[in-house]
Amino acid sequence: MAEFVRAQIFGTTFEITSRYTDLQPVGMGAFGLVCSAKDQLTGQPVAVKKIMKPFSTPVLSKRTYRELKLLKHLRHENIISLSDIFISPLEDIYFVTELLGTDLHRLLTSRPLEKQFIQYFLYQILRGLKYVHSAGVVHRDLKPSNILINENCDLKICDFGLARIQDPQMTGYVSTRYYRAPEIMLTWQKYDVEVDIWSAACIFAEMLEGKPLFPGKDHVNQFSIITELLGTPPDDVIRGICSENTLRFVKSLPKRERQPLANKFKNADPDAIDLLERMLVFDSKKRIRAGEALAHEYLAPYHDPTDEPEAQEKFDWSFNDADLPVDTWKIMMYSEILDFHNIEQANEGEVLVEGAGTAPQGFA
């Protein structure tokens, strides 16, 4: 039986195994608090995420189960990896992952990025998305604060709590507004992996400009700002709008022409503009896919088709439509945690090679 110790962090009780020491708060989300810690077993710094009251409602239980299953399944250099998971005596759940020094949001607010860093970060984002999408998963909440970076410029996508199956009938209103694809705002359904490409494009533009591309005050303003740059949506996109209210709103907007992105990004490389044009497309079916984007000329310094893997198998979403009581989710969670530890013991000594390509020099 593991020995647990308690610590108070921002008024929140962290109840963790004695394997982890030197807790320091690093971030707070809607569903959990994240602390850095030292892993006494490996000597390495780690991030410990406490999931608040995971068994308080069936919805929270299912969300936690989904994130756990995804973190177990997704094994890729550009995706955050799970190193430990446990349930405390107080029945909180703790995810332990590798610790990266910063995130892209903090980086963007502290300094302008040079071209080679923008290329390398975008390359790694798309490399991770190619893998995730091949597993049948859509992240749905890609934004700079969910992109972690270390001092070697290794980049990892995190926070899969909102991720969903690839499904032409997806519903919901999920990602942070600035990075949200127009099809989510327009239809509230029928969206797929392309929503992540739109988010990646918004992040790419923010790296180029140093500020958000579409900083909408609300979803109406957000959509209006998008049309100022990209013009009025094409007729086939408008025909796909399901909500009468949304349809009336879109038709009420003045007709606008798409503006050349080169006019907005005056200092950007022409290849960067070309890739951005292919990512920022209203019609999601015409938006470039992650694998295609990796082969674009702008990313040529890092592109290696032999080192951009896809998932070996699709993620099992069979639980996703289940409407189960908390106790059932809890049993399923215990089973997954037990399975994780059995797999970890079997795989001891197996190490992922860190970092894709060769990082640019001079980043600190």
From Swiss-Prot:
The keyword Phosphoprotein applies. Its EC number is 2.7.11.24. Residues 20-299 form the Protein kinase domain. Dually phosphorylated on Thr-171 and Tyr-173, which activates the enzyme. PROSITE patterns: MAPK (PS01351), PROTEIN_KINASE_ATP (PS00107), PROTEIN_KINASE_DOM (PS50011), PROTEIN_KINASE_ST (PS00108). ATP binds at residues 26-34, 49. The modification Phosphotyrosine is found at residue 173. It comes from the Eukaryota. It holds the Pfam family Pkinase. SUPFAM superfamilies: Protein kinase-like (PK-like). The active site is at residue 141. This is Mitogen-activated protein kinase hog1.
